[in-house]
Amino acid sequence: MRRKFIGVICRVLCATVILCGCGAEVKMPEQENLPVLTIGSDEYEPFIYISDSKTYEGIDVDIAEEACRRIGYRAEFKIIRWDDKDTYIENGNVDCLWGSFSMDGREDAYQWAGPYMTSKQCVLVRTDSDIYTLNDLNGKKVAVQATTKPEEIFLKRSASDIPMVESVYSFVETEEAFAALRKGYVDACASHDYRIGTYLKNALSKYRVLDQELMTSHLGVAFSKGFDSNVVQKLSAALNEMKSDGTIDEIMRKYE
């Protein structure tokens, strides 16, 4: 069963939503006068986030800037509300969705550039939890980010090893899902392994990650069906080249 938090829980967590939606100006380095590829994403460290110096940083930021450079474009980033992502590309507010976005199960929903890397979907629990396997999640409460693969996995239960949880709590931002786990509102939180790893840097002793992962995701860049397919193909070729020449591996090591 899927539920949304209301009342006091929403008030506790709403600050995250307000901050993410504030639309503060973000500085970008000066670049050549090139055609722009407008990239939509939410803040999802370490893939894309706004640094203290008000610049975009992260794995996907570095990959996007280099891939765009190789095809003669300039990457321009726009923070969006992730559960409204399809509206943004359908209305042309952004050209593509790029932010640790899983292609799996969505192959026919968009034009894709990639995949350019893989990521595991994992489950995070508190250190003192009695949950050690996916099966232990039966009857438990799980927090996820709305419209992500973990949400889909727990709601649809398309694989036989996915447990029947009591409730799936869907949040606009992953930080809210982590907060729900931290405050004891839920028993577990599911997200990308890199995202969980970033969260654990400051709280390693308080949490642990289950050995069993939910799935392995192939990450890509999503465009609407009506977008210029030549640009999509060129970007996909650039990403493949970056995988082959070690550029993507080098970028990933930077954020370990």
What is each PLM-predicted segment?
Residues 28-100, 170, 245:
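Extracytoplasmic small-molecule ligand-binding "clamshell" domains
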Residues 17-21:
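C-terminal motif of bacterial Sec signal peptides marking the signal peptidase cleavage site
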Residues 1-12:
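Bacterial N-terminal signal peptides that target proteins for export
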Residues 23, 61-70, 131, 135-136, ...:
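Extended ligand-binding regions for polar small-molecule ligands
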Residues 73, 81, 114-164, 226-228:
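A conserved helix-loop-strand patch within extracytoplasmic ligand-binding domains
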Residues 41-43, 118-125, 197, 201-240, ...:
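Periplasmic-binding protein-like
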Residues 87, 100-109, 153-156, 180-216:
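A ligand-binding cleft/hinge motif common to bilobed small-molecule-binding domains
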Residues 49-53, 64-73, 150-171, 200-205, ...:
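Ligand-binding cleft/hinge of the Venus flytrap
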